[in-house]
């Protein structure tokens, strides 16, 4: 491999790294939403998978049936985290796609966790 070719590969690697960092910051600012109980519980998560908001409709709050509320919150939280993970993978794949070369591993697998 010539020095010129190696230099070009290094420039490409630096460009990829910069694009990945930029996209990671963008993804962290994105949000997804999930609901359960027909919209009685709504959870929002950011692209990093952090829960940023939980809203519970008053009608679902029953002191005699806390277990149902817990189940609804758990279901909505799990779905929000799943959607945040899917969002992050989808967005990061957009960055890695142009740089996937024949014979090179798929880079999108590196972005499962932000």
UniProtKB/Swiss-Prot annotation:
Q: Where in the cell is it found?
A: Cytoplasm, Nucleoid
Alphabetical list of InterPro entries matching this protein: YbaB-like_sf (IPR036894), YbaB/EbfC (IPR004401)
> Keywords assigned by UniProt?
Cytoplasm, DNA-binding
**Disulfides per UniProt:** none
Q: Name one Pfam family in it.
A: YbaB_DNA_bd
Q: Which family does it belong to?
A: Belongs to the YbaB/EbfC family.
NCBIfam families assigned to the protein according to its UniProt record, in alphabetical order: DNA_YbaB_EbfC
This chain's protein is named Nucleoid-associated protein THEYE_A1069
Organism of origin: Thermodesulfovibrio yellowstonii (strain ATCC 51303 / DSM 11347 / YP87)
Q: Give the organism's phylogenetic lineage.
A: Bacteria, Pseudomonadati, Nitrospirota, Thermodesulfovibrionia, Thermodesulfovibrionales
């Amino acid at each position: 491999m010539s020095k010129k070719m190696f230099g070009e590969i290094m420039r490409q690697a630096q460009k990829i790294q910069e694009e990945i960092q930029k996209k990671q910051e963008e993804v962290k600012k994105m949000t997804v939403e999930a609901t359960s109980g027909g919209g009685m519980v709504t959870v929002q998560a950011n692209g990093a998978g952090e829960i940023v908001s939980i809203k519970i409709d008053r009608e679902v709050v029953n002191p005699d049936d806390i277990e149902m509320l817990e189940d609804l919150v758990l279901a909505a939280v799990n779905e929000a985290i799943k959607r945040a993970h899917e969002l992050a993978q989808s967005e990061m794949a957009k960055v890695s796609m142009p740089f996937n070369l024949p014979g090179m591993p798929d880079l999108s697998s590196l972005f499962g966790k932000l």
